[in-house]
A protein has these predicted regions:
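Catalytic alpha/beta active-site cores
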Residues: 1-124, 142-145, 149-158
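Short alpha-helical functional segments enriched in proximate histidine and acidic residues
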Residues: 138
Length: 173
């Protein structure tokens, strides 16, 4: 998808440093939850960290990855497992980028997450609060991040499709 955005921007004379958007190029969730992967994990992670590097240099407003817990939850995990697997995937991507020589203080501020929300209102709120604290702790304690923006757990939430019911005409009586 990023290549398409780049091609269109070049065709229309738009500088890459003006582009903004988000990729959900989270290959590890495909292995865990969906089974729709094409390439093995190692080359897939290399491609992802290559995108981190390319965006770091050429597209500074681009959110380099949206790491998905949504699909993991829809595949049957608990909310605790959703966070655990999502952050395990995130740690893998961050470690790979650091091993490539990238600075987590810089690229870390453009990582985002995609979480699921089920019907347990208070439990879900607690999960989101815990996610913010856990991610900040992971970035600070494990990777030595000091940039406050790179410590933020930025995320999008969507209603879990598995919590929706089929049409039931008596629900609104």
């Amino acid at each position: 998808m990023l290549a398409f955005y780049i091609a269109v921007s070049e065709k229309h004379g738009v500088s890459l440093n003006k582009l903004s958007g988000t990729l959900q190029n989270d290959i590890l969730k495909e292995y865990i939850a969906r089974g729709t992967y094409i390439y093995p994990p190692k080359p897939s992670i290399k491609l992802i960290t290559d995108i981190f590097e390319f965006c770091d240099i050429h597209i500074p407003k681009w959110n380099i990855i949206s790491i998905s817990g949504y699909h993991i939850r829809e595949a049957g995990s608990t909310l605790e497992q959703e966070l655990a697997f999502t952050f395990a995937n995130a740690i893998t991507y961050v470690e790979s980028a650091i091993n490539k020589g990238l600075d987590p203080n810089k690229f870390g501020q453009r990582i985002s997450f995609f979480f699921n929300s089920h019907n347990g209102f208070l439990e879900e709120i607690s999960k989101f609060r815990a996610a913010r604290k856990l991610w900040a702790s992971i970035m600070k304690d494990r990777f030595g991040v000091t940039n406050k923006r790179a410590l933020m757990c930025r995320f999008h939430v969507q209603t879990g499709g598995s919590t929706l019911t089929a049409s039931q005409i008596d629900n609104n009586i």
